[in-house]
Curated annotation (Swiss-Prot):
Tissue: Expressed in the adaxial epidermis of the cotyledons and leaves, and in the vascular cylinder of wild-type torpedo stage embryos. Confined in the central zone and the organizing center in the shoot apical meristem.
Superkingdom to which the source organism belongs: Eukaryota
Cystines in this chain: none
Protein name: Protein LITTLE ZIPPER 3
Presence of keyword Transcription regulation: yes
Biological role stated in the UniProt entry: Competitive inhibitor of the HD-ZIPIII transcription factors in shoot apical meristem (SAM) development. Acts by forming non-functional heterodimers. Part of a negative feedback loop. Involved in SAM development and lateral organ patterning. Essential for proper functioning of stem cells in the SAM.
Induction: Up-regulated in response to increased HD-ZIPIII activity. Up-regulated by ATHB-14. Up-regulated by REV.
Subcellular location as annotated: Nucleus
Gene coding for it: ZPR3
Amino acid sequence: MERLNSKLFVENCYIMKENERLRKKAELLNQENQQLLFQLKQKLSKTKNSNNGSNNDNKSSSASGQS
């Protein structure tokens, strides 16, 4: 019984260590994901603003050039 208890204790320590390693890895991946999402939103915002600016130019020039 003592031997089984020691074996389970060692196995439990290994599992806790592996769990901590995976938790840290998940945290790093989450941070990377958040950074990539932020960059994507910035690019989409810039693209949307650029398109809106060119659309506004087209609308104003076509409105002023009515015959």
